[in-house]
A protein has these predicted regions:
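Short beta-strand segments in beta-sandwich/barrel cores
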Residues: 45-46, 70-75, 98
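Double-stranded beta-helix
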Residues: 2-11, 99-122
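A generic structural signal for short beta-strands and their flanking turns/coil linkers
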Residues: 31-36, 42, 63, 68-70, ...
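Glycine- and acidic-residue-biased ligand/ion/polar-headgroup-sensing regions
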Residues: 52-78
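A short, N-terminal "cap"/entry segment at the start of jelly-roll beta-barrel domains
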Residues: 1-39, 47
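Conserved short histidine dyad/triad with adjacent acidic residue
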Residues: 37-58
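Short acidic-glycine-tyrosine-enriched beta hairpin
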Residues: 76-95
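Short beta-strand segments
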Residues: 36, 80-82, 107
Length: 122
């Protein structure tokens, strides 16, 4: 019989800050892969605060997740745009930029795209 597992993003196994103190990603690891909680502050923009870490022109992570609070705008490399807010579930393919809208931090749970997100390239 399989055992239950309990982990908390309030006690993460790993935390990764983004540039200029504009947020962080907290991670717990499960058999299916890492689950992350991203918290980005007002003024955060992927191309300003994660691009220097990722060293790619746009975010190349696939994201599958749920917005807890705040708002974010995502623009794909091909120009497609979407905004996400509290209660929204989303799937975002690789090749995008994103930024926080408004004056509230953006908090997002992601169970697909966090394995290498905001992880310095060696």
């Amino acid at each position: 019989m399989a055992s239950m597992i309990r982990k908390s993003l309030d006690d993460p196994e790993e935390s990764r800050p983004v540039a200029q103190g504009m947020g962080q990603v907290d991670l717990v690891n499960l058999e299916a892969g890492p689950v992350g909680r991203a918290t980005f502050l007002p003024g955060w923009k992927w191309s300003d605060h994660v691009k220097p870490i990722a060293k790619t022109d746009s975010c190349m992570a696939s994201h599958t997740g749920y917005t807890i609070s705040g708002r974010i705008k995502v623009v794909m490399d091909d120009g497609e745009e979407l905004e996400f807010g509290p209660g929204d579930f989303g799937v975002i393919p690789p090749g995008h930029d994103a930024w926080v809208l408004g004056d509230e931090p953006y908090v997002y749970i992601d169970w697909q795209g966090m394995a290498d997100y905001a992880k310095p390239k060696e």
